[in-house]
Curated annotation (Swiss-Prot):
Binding site for Ca(2+) 1: E261, D344, D351, C462, D465
Gene3D superfamilies, per the entry: 2.60.120.830, 3.40.1620.60, Collagenase (Catalytic Domain), Thrombospondin type-1 (TSP1) repeat
Record's signal peptide: 1-49
Superkingdom field: Eukaryota
A cellular-component GO term for this protein: extracellular region
Source organism of this protein record: Homo sapiens
Entry comment on modification after translation: The precursor is cleaved by a furin endopeptidase. Glycosylated. Can be O-fucosylated by POFUT2 on a serine or a threonine residue found within the consensus sequence C1-X(2)-(S/T)-C2-G of the TSP type-1 repeat domains where C1 and C2 are the first and second cysteine residue of the repeat, respectively. Fucosylated repeats can then be further glycosylated by the addition of a beta-1,3-glucose residue by the glucosyltransferase, B3GALTL. Fucosylation mediates the efficient secretion of ADAMTS family members.
Name assigned to this protein: A disintegrin and metalloproteinase with thrombospondin motifs 1
Subcellular location: Secreted, Extracellular space, Extracellular matrix
Motif annotated as Cysteine switch, chain positions: 196-203
């Protein structure tokens, strides 16, 4: 994220009438933050990244705390700005895990020791002001009253005077704090606009895992193309509406609750600047980011939780932090791994890590960088990390923005967002320059779409486990913990104070500073923190001053519920089996005030337009998609004609089967031309499964998703294998050159031709070749071999070839051939005898043996294997009487029933043959002699020993022999 600061930081001279002071040219106002983001706007009050101008009033007040009996609520009363402000507060620390740990690294003792855990959970409250439902408050009641509240368009920030906080901390609820150290500073301001930039260039699609920097000269973001949907996809209809989203790979289109377990790390600069209040400050920042991720515009159920906090007191014990943002990120990513237990079941295991630093971060050319993150890496333990420059409470927005990048969100003005966001590109959380935040929809349609598709493609499976001991986040508004003076100090340094400006109450925080020795007011164009008092019974919420009394209307969570299923969308294909969708939205009601987002299936899909497509010269649907890119490939590779694209199947990972991977015909280069094939495209040539939104889902041979129907060996969908017969054979001799083995006819299915090379040899000097019906070679012709695995498209059928150098050279095809082809063997040199076997299935004609025509007939199946390989065995086949519908019948004439058994293998079995004894191994004394043992076929051919009966194998083919005694 990058700063965008108007000329002079929006400075103005400090005069007696601050309300009439003129604003610097180029200053902008920031619109109100959504009611649900009551914590977020307060944190934005002191930003130097996405700044806002403001004018404010201030008064000293004495808070009156009272515990409401029996209701678990606390009432806070303030008298200021000629009004009474009554805040009704409830404990709210939902973003903290109960058993979180805080460790201090590198204390002077040199050891890493946990601090004694003080219970911060009881500090944080949220609520309403003066009963106004549009008001909001977020306060901390520890060590005084700190935070912000929002009432009637004005934001209020309250903070104890330095000496008062300790005395106030000793006051019990309902008891007035001791005098005289009881004063708090209460400021109010009006709502304004925010301006800010995040200068990442988003012009091109981004590969997942590329580092993303928030400096426009430095960064490139990345995303997984496989995780994207196409804007033309029917499933995108309604994106930008309140649609329930979120899923994992195993459950397509299912909205599931995600828990982002987080480790917060503060470096030495943070420890020195914030002191003992650091932990509370970090949790306050994170509570705002967590509330942003609860807004329904993100279209997912996401909970940010803290499981661990590390505070580094000795820079030698932590990652190297420099002004180089990219280097700091890399150092931190490498360093944080040592603190992450590998098991996701460990209570301290985290999914992402965030480093906070006061170091001024710089990009390649400027030092306007506020944050940096790796993109699309939320479940990568080595790269799920972010670096945030702490420039005040508005660093909460930087945190939410950088986590958005970790969730694979691009900037809203990126090219891939244009069709989703339209002209509204700068009013959402992922805007490269934030201005006029859309309070009703802080997340853009593109951000919701990108995180949904990212999770839907299985990239968030580590987020499914519920944290065991999350740290409770503060429930009070940040403005109640940090008044305007403190917010100015966070942003502009310890000497800065708040500049009252009634015209910008709640909307923009103005702070003192010097320019050329002149005292001026300056701003970073962010509103006051939520919870800052803006009048009697009022406080700042979302840049507006609102009544505190209506807290229940914006603070009570309302859980979302699914609406009705919508109509089915258009089919993705006009024939051949497409996919269509119906969706439902989480709008009955839409969740609000941090209520739960809908969980469960949000999208249904089904098959459509199942009829066969007209023949397109035998081309498959995937071929057509590859060819569609030919016209975009005018530039050739080197020289020659333009590229012709054909599908690539061989060597493609199963997870990439639904990407459109095409190779240049005749060249071999291959590219991912589209992140997804059209829905309904078969996942592979030998599979009936189809692609749906870039994922392979099961479908039957009838092209219906989730159907159990399969092709039988005959290529018949749902058949029982009785309509075809097996043809098999072998070749064990061949002369040099090309010679035909078998011509496989049209309609043949499940073809397999294989040749196993001799052990230790890459080949035997003989190779398989294929010749098309027109006599042209489609494999290994003209004495040119294809050594690598490849897929050959032949009239719409894919022939899979292992490559000539494989130990088992093999050709396979599963679909029925549309034209015959001839298998040949190419023999070269002094080749060993080939060992080629082939099998395929062809349709057989049904035989009828009825003398008199009847409505039933004897139907036979193929003969089974012979029971013996020699010396007379038996074959069996199934003979059934069936009617004209193929159902079992009993009317067939038994006198003409075909035989169901027959003799086979009536030739003699191979026999063992012993040779003559050899000479004795010794010429004198005792030696040994041996004789050869062969296995011979019935025609005298020598066979391997495995062909003869091992039980009859002679045992005496070596023996002792005794010659004359040696002299």
């Amino acid at each position: 994220m990058q700063r965008a600061v108007p000329e002079g930081f929006g400075r103005r001279k400090l005069g007696s009438d601050m309300g009439n002071a003129e604003r610097a040219p180029g200053s902008r106002s920031f619109g109100p933050v959504p009611t649900l983001l009551l914590l977020a706007a307060a944190l934005l009050a002191v930003s130097d990244a996405l700044g806002r101008p403001s004018e404010e009033d201030e008064e000293l007040v004495v808070p009156e705390l009272e515990r409401a009996p029996g209701h678990g609520t606390t009432r806070l009363r303030l008298h200021a700005f000629d009004q009474q402000l009554d805040l009704e507060l409830r404990p709210d620390s939902s973003f903290l895990a109960p058993g979180f740990t805080l460790q201090n690294v590198g204390r002077k003792s040199g050891s890493e020791t946990p601090l004694p855990e003080t219970d911060l959970a009881h500090c944080f409250y949220s609520g309403t002001v003066n009963g106004d439902p549009s008001s909001a408050a977020a306060l901390s009641l520890c060590e005084g009253v700190r935070g912000a509240f929002y009432l009637l368009g004005e934001a209020y920030f309250i903070q104890p005077l330095p000496a008062a906080s300790e005395r106030l901390a000793t006051a019990a609820p309902g008891e007035k704090p001791p005098a005289p150290l009881q004063f708090h500073l209460l400021r109010r301001n009006r709502q304004g606009d925010v301006g800010g930039t995040c200068g990442v260039v988003d012009d091109e699609p981004r590969p997942t895992g590329k580092a993303e920097t928030e400096d426009e000269d430095e960064g490139t973001e990345g995303e997984d193309e496989g995780a994207q949907w196409s804007p033309q996809d029917p499933a995108l209809q309604g994106v930008g509406q309140p649609t329930g989203t979120g899923s994992i790979r195993k459950k397509r289109f299912v909205s599931s609750h995600r828990y982002v377990e987080t480790m917060l790390v503060a470096d030495q600069s943070m420890a020195e600047f914030h002191g003992s209040g650091l932990k509370h400050y970090l949790l306050t920042l994170f509570s705002v980011a967590a509330r942003l991720y609860k807004h329904p515009s993100i279209r997912n159920s996401v909970s940010l939780v803290v499981v661990k906090i590390l505070v580094i007191h000795d820079e030698q014990k932590g990652p190297e932090v420099t002004s180089n943002a990219a280097l700091t990120l890399r150092n931190f990513c490498n360093w944080q791994k040592q603190h992450n237990p590998p098991s996701d079941r460990d209570a301290e295991h985290y999914d992402t890590a965030i480093l906070f630093t006061r170091q001024d971060l710089c990009g390649s050319q400027t030092c306007d960088t506020l944050g940096m993150a790796d993109v699309g890496t939320v479940c990568d333990p080595s790269r799920s990390c972010s670096v945030i420059e702490d420039d005040g409470l508005q660093a909460a927005f930087t945190t939410a923005h950088e986590l958005g990048h970790v969730f694979n969100m691009p900037h809203d003005d990126a090219k891939q967002c244009a069709s989703l966001n339209g002209v509204n590109q700068d009013s959402h959380m992922m805007a490269s320059m934030l201005s006029n935040l859309d309070h009703s929809q802080p997340w853009s349609p593109c951000s919701a779409y990108m995180i949904t598709s990212f999770l839907d493609n299985g990239h968030g499976e580590c987020l499914m486990d519920k944290p065991q001991n999350p740290i409770q986040l503060p429930g009070d508004l940040p403005g109640t913990s940090y008044d305007a003076n403190r917010q100015c100090q966070f942003t502009f340094g310890e000497d800065s104070k708040h500049c009252p400006d009634a015209a910008s109450t709640c909307s923009t925080l103005w702070c003192t500073g010097t320019s050329g020795g002149v005292l001026v007011c300056q701003t970073k164009h962010f509103p006051w923190a939520d919870g800052t008092s803006c009048g009697e019974g009022k406080w700042c919420i979302n840049g507006k001053c609102v009544n505190k009394t209506d807290r229940k209307h914006f603070d009570t969570p309302f859980h979302g519920s699914w609406g009705m299923w919508g109509p089915w969308g258009d089919c993705s294909r006009t024939c051949g089996g497409g996919v269509q969708y119906t969706m439902r939205e989480c709008d009955n009601p839409v969740p609000k005030n941090g209520g739960k987002y809908c969980e469960g299936k949000r999208v249904r899909y089904r098959s459509c337009n199942l009829e066969d497509c007209p023949d397109n010269n035998g081309k498959t649907f995937r071929e057509e998609q590859c060819e569609a890119h030919n016209e975009f490939s005018k530039a050739s590779f080197g020289s020659g004609p333009a590229v012709e694209w054909i599908p690539k199947y061989a060597g493609v990972s199963p997870k990439d089967r639904c990407k459109l991977i095409c190779q240049a015909k005749g060249i071999g280069y291959f590219f991912v031309l589209q992140p997804k094939v059209v829905d309904g495209t078969p996942c592979s040539p030998d599979s009936t499964s189809v692609c749906v939104q870039g994922q392979c889902v099961k479908a039957g041979c009838d092209r219906i998703i989730d159907s159990k129907k399969k092709f039988d060996k005959c290529g018949v969908c749902g058949g029982n294998g009785s309509t075809c017969k097996k043809i098999s054979g072998s070749v064990t001799s061949a002369k040099p050159g090309y010679h035909d083995i078998i011509t496989i006819p049209t309609g043949a299915t499940n073809i397999e031709v294989k040749q196993r090379n001799q052990r230790g040899s890459r080949n035997n000097g003989s190779f398989l070749a294929i010749k098309a019906a027109d006599g042209t070679y489609i494999l290994n012709g003209d004495y040119t071999l294809s050594t690598l695995e490849q897929d050959i498209m032949y009239k719409g059928v894919v022939l899979r070839y292992s490559g000539s150098s494989a130990a088992l050279e093999r050709i396979r095809s599963f679909s029925p051939l549309k034209e015959p082809l001839t298998i040949q063997v190419l023999t070269v040199g002094n080749a060993l005898r080939p060992k080629i076997k082939y099998t395929y299935f062809v349709k057989k004609k049904k035989e009828s043996f009825n003398a008199i025509p009847t409505f039933s007939a004897w139907v036979i199946e193929e003969w089974g294997e012979c029971s013996k390989s020699c010396e007379l065995g038996w074959q069996r086949r199934l003979v059934e009487c069936r009617d004209i519908n193929g159902q079992p019948a009993s009317e067939c004439a038994k006198e003409v029933k075909p035989a169901s058994t027959r003799p086979c293998a009536d030739h003699p079995c191979p026999q063992w043959q012993l040779g003559e004894w050899s000479s004795c191994s010794k010429t004198c004394g005792k030696g040994y002699k041996k004789r050869s043992l062969k296995c011979l076929s019935h025609d005298g051919g020598v066979l391997s020993h495995e062909s003869c009966d091992p039980l009859k194998k002679p045992k005496h083919f070596i023996d002792f022999c005794t010659m004359a005694e040696c002299s």
